[in-house]
């Protein structure tokens, strides 16, 4: 029979070209030069018909034995030829049938296939492939030309991958191995097949090769990296290959291969990775790559340019996965700096004491030394020996620390009442260090210091981007750092820049993350407040945080009560130094009757009168109190309706004109009042019914009303812009019996929550809402 090759849809193997070197020669730090860097070839990607890689399929099979006698020629002629239907599977090492009978009783190994061709002789069966095997030929007939070509390319791919697995599993000469790797990469790039395994299979073969041959020279490292670089443009490296890349970053951080080849790989990882938990070595590779950038002469400037390249020149980063991935890398790297300290045998007892709170907070006594290092000479000598042998990254320079809980009578009483023997200690209580005593000093090794400085600096860079700051604040709100880092002065001092950026941001979704995630846990506000473990500036950052929080929606009794219970001393000290925010805080505490103790009230008044700004604001407070007494004096109307189009200023002017102590029903329907009028409404002591129909009264105003008008019985919010954020606050108004939320942004969940928490609620209007 006359069998000839065909072009298979016009696709042919490319010719491999060797072009100019990718990186040229590069001078090493010590003045010596590396060997010539391997060349990078101009690779022409396949541009013809594309096919999906077949793993299995139905096809007709005919086997022909090579004729050796006249009788066998007759028996194998086309007139006696027989076709069998088979469901064939293209396994990793052979071609097998789901029904191993007839021609396919035995599987056909790829190593036994000498050639794969398309049949094109005259009068040949249509859409056939010819597999040349020892002693005969196997014909495969597809249903159409596309399926025939798909089978042809899939069989060729499986056969070649099988061959490369065999060849590269036993390397002898690395010159030959490198040539085979380049050919393998070219084959993958030029293949007309489309499948994830087309690029992943060569990477896994090379990855296995590298994992089994660890004693490679630097030149061989770089040659292999450059050879496989084209495959990494659109694919993540396998885990073993990540280990190889990490090793190269650690050993040759100044290699140009790191910049030329690894940069696009890391950029792709940061843009497309969805979960480092499923591929932790990708995170480790990214971490080592950034550290390699930091080792260059420009250092952090190179890292800064890399972060800028990830963000892009526009105001908003177009890649939503970049920030979470960079933060994940930073958190893991920072934890690694303290990992040996956490796991250290010598330090574990006292750290366990700190973390688990073996002494109850309310029962702790001051000046109880907790030994971190034993002073026994034998133990010290043993420690020195072990240090020299394993290069410890953490040294504790003091022999003892004194842990002291911040004392506040009110807080301690609450802790005694609410905390059981097995409760988790408060983070601040665990880490407060008595300033008068010998403090713990965590000294990291030079390498750990560089790692810490690099990644804290990256967090500072991230906080400088306006579009990244809200997401960064949410990611850092749970304080995802080890307690040992929070006890490290260097770390908290550097991280202060990030917290300062949060405190300066006017957006509520940013500065609200300064507070704790949930009740009973500490947030950045507590850590950087006076008495907190991270406070080193006499409360300047604390004042900034209070200022921004009070300026949004946190001017509430609950927030002021928390400050009065926990931070009254620092507030008074800062007010004494003329801080206007703290002066305002003290005035609000007096105005809202937060402070019940007369002596404390007198002390606050004395503090206010000690500065010009405090004296002025206290006088204004006294004027407001006199006006409030006049307003709340018995008398005046019991019902009042403002004209339509009235504003907040009109309402304030009206309420300042006389006594409204008897006012029970106030209608502001169809006026132009906003949430700002809530400050006037809370001055009405007898108010029972409030109509805000079709006004601009919003969530911020509802929160104020819910704290002060707890006796309100009827509230009409029809056609107001209130949402779940404000409506949830109504759950504290237990006297409400009639509530109109018609045409608001009420959700079904919030409605159910309000019904459960308002026992006196009888009439509710939720028409034209999600809860309707």
Swiss-Prot record:
Protein name per the record: C-Maf-inducing protein
Function: Plays a role in T-cell signaling pathway.
Gene3D superfamilies: Ribonuclease Inhibitor
GO cellular component: a single term: cytosol
InterPro entries the UniProt entry points to: CMIP, LRR_dom_sf, PH_CMIP
Keywords, alphabetical: Cytoplasm, Leucine-rich repeat, Nucleus, Repeat
Organism of derivation: Xenopus laevis
Domain PH as annotated: residue spans: 52-160
Ranges: LRR repeats: 662-683, 686-706, 711-731, 735-755
Source taxon at top rank: Eukaryota
Family annotation (SUPFAM superfamilies): PH domain-like, RNI-like
CDD domains for this protein: PH
Predominant cellular place of this UniProt entry's protein: nucleus
